[in-house]
Regions:
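Short, solvent-exposed aromatic-acidic interface loops
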Residues: 147-155
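Glycine-rich phosphate-binding loop signature in dinucleotide/nucleotide-binding domains
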Residues: 43-45, 93-97
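Domain-level recognition of soluble alpha/beta enzyme cores
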Residues: 118-146
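Generic beta-sheet signal
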Residues: 3-4, 95-106
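Short active-site segment of divalent metal-dependent hydrolases/proteases
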Residues: 11, 107-108
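Hydrophobic packing residues within well-ordered alpha-helices of enzyme cores
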Residues: 60-64, 87, 111-112
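Active-site-proximal alpha-helix that buttresses catalytic centers in soluble enzyme cores
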Residues: 2-82, 120-121, 130-131
Length: 155
């Protein structure tokens, strides 16, 4: 099956945000990216949508959830500063059934570096701009065997 790793879309400026960073929303551009992800991932096969509980991650996947009639499940293992082991365990848990997981720019490179150094076939150079997707393809046992990159949708 397949696990889709999505980095949250463009958020408002961190320096200009005085409130709790967990509450920082997407920017206007980020909202457009989130809606464009619906078409980009229209043929993707997954039955769960998991997200960091941070507002910007939840907002990134809400349009996909609405289009598919699926709930968005907030998961701390995808939050900023989450331990790599927790995220790896989450990917492994959902590798057979398929899932979309929205996360942050600190966790995504750690996951990708782990898979690259573990011998997973990386079909593209490692990068993780906001709104991008990495598609993790698994074998019948749920082991990640290939990863490919989908650039962020252009608005």
């Amino acid at each position: 099956m397949t696990v889709y790793l999505v980095r949250h879309a463009k958020a408002g400026d961190r320096d200009g945000w005085a409130d709790d960073d967990r509450l920082r929303p997407l920017s206007g551009r980020g909202h457009r990216q989130a809606y464009l992800l619906v078409d980009l991932l229209a043929d993707a096969k997954f039955d769960r949508i998991l997200s960091s509980p941070y507002v910007r991650c939840m907002q990134t996947v809400v349009p996909i959830a609405g289009a598919r009639g699926l709930p968005v499940e907030p998961v701390e293992a995808l939050a900023e500063d989450a331990p790599l082991g927790d995220a790896l365990e989450l990917v492994q848990k959902h590798a057979i059934s398929g899932a979309l997981m929205c996360m942050h720019g600190d966790l995504m490179p750690m996951l990708l570096d782990h898979y690259a150094s573990s011998g997973v076939e990386m079909r593209h150079e490692l990068r993780w701009p906001k709104g991008c997707t990495w598609v993790l393809e698994t074998d019948a046992t749920g082991e990640v065997v290939r990863a490919r990159y989908l650039p962020p949708p252009v608005d």
